[in-house]
Amino acid sequence: MQVLIFDDKKAVAENAATLLQKLILAKNNANIGLATGSTPIDLYKQLVSMYKNKHISFAQVNTFNLDEYYDIDENNSNSYRYFMNSQLFDHIDIDKNNTHLPTCNAKQDPRKQGEHFEQQIAALGGLDLQLLGIGGNGHIGFNEPSSSFASRTRIKSLTEQTVSDNSRMFSDDEQQPKMAMTMGIATIMDAKYVLLIATGKNKAQAVNDMVNGPLSASCPASILQMHKNAIVIIDNDAASLLANKDYFTWVSQQNHEINQAFGHFPDL
């Protein structure tokens, strides 16, 4: 696991965007898993800027999002399809037919929808990189604590805390989803590369639990210790409880030199 620590969230977004740019330049038809939430917004702004300045093209890129609320209209401003369109897809040259979310409505069998999403990923050769955030309790996607490390794309009931955290996004007269479709932990682990970004002191404990263990379903993100190509980009606040922060700070420069000399993505 490479842990790269930067001064602030702006530097996190810039460096994460640069990595994604290098990935797409190395493989213009890359299959990239994307995330929603507040953490990647600045990253997406950086990617839009790169596109507008003709430093990158998404014309042949395929994307697969981590999750989507169950039985939500894609035009609902709280759907993750709406989020991705407004934050990224509407502002770049991506073909929206090549953008995928794990959707399921009340008339569809969630098990079959999950299998279909897995088949879509497999048909394109698997994910080259999966972008992740991390919840305060260590969740990735909607894989909350106690989620199976062997899980695949499926429907999940949201925890009371997650429902509470997200309630500010829904109006009083709007029915808030209590379930969501999410990639499973095994689906995430199948990606050739995983890029997790985190900022803020509210993520510091989860970051330390992820990096330093123990490996436990109590912190779903701790499974990334077992990933061959996990890259973690965090700011100083998110690194503030990292037990071995000085070590990771020291080795960052060595990792940077190796990556510059031999490339960031040798396993593509």
Swiss-Prot record:
Signal sequence coordinates: none
Single biological process term from Gene Ontology: carbohydrate metabolic process
Assigned EC number: 3.5.99.6
GO molecular function terms attached to this record: glucosamine-6-phosphate deaminase activity; identical protein binding
A UniProt-annotated Pfam family: Glucosamine_iso
Catalytic reactions on record: alpha-D-glucosamine 6-phosphate + H2O = beta-D-fructose 6-phosphate + NH4(+)
Entry keywords, A to Z: Carbohydrate metabolism, Hydrolase
Entry GO CC: cytoplasm
Active site residues of this protein: 67 (proton acceptor), 137 (for ring-opening step), 139 (proton acceptor), 144 (for ring-opening step)
Pathway in which this enzyme or protein is active: Amino-sugar metabolism; N-acetylneuraminate degradation; D-fructose 6-phosphate from N-acetylneuraminate: step 5/5
Presence of the UniProt keyword Hydrolase in the record: yes
Annotated disulfide bonds: none
Keyword Hydrolase: yes
InterPro entries the UniProt entry points to: Glc/Gal-6P_isomerase (IPR006148), Glucosamine6P_isomerase (IPR004547), Glucosamine6P_isomerase_CS (IPR018321), NagB/RpiA_transferase-like (IPR037171)
Domain of life per record: Bacteria
NCBIfam families reported for this sequence: nagB
Main function: Catalyzes the reversible isomerization-deamination of glucosamine 6-phosphate (GlcN6P) to form fructose 6-phosphate (Fru6P) and ammonium ion.
Self-association state and partner proteins as the record states: Homohexamer.
Similarity section: Belongs to the glucosamine/galactosamine-6-phosphate isomerase family. NagB subfamily.
Protein name: Glucosamine-6-phosphate deaminase
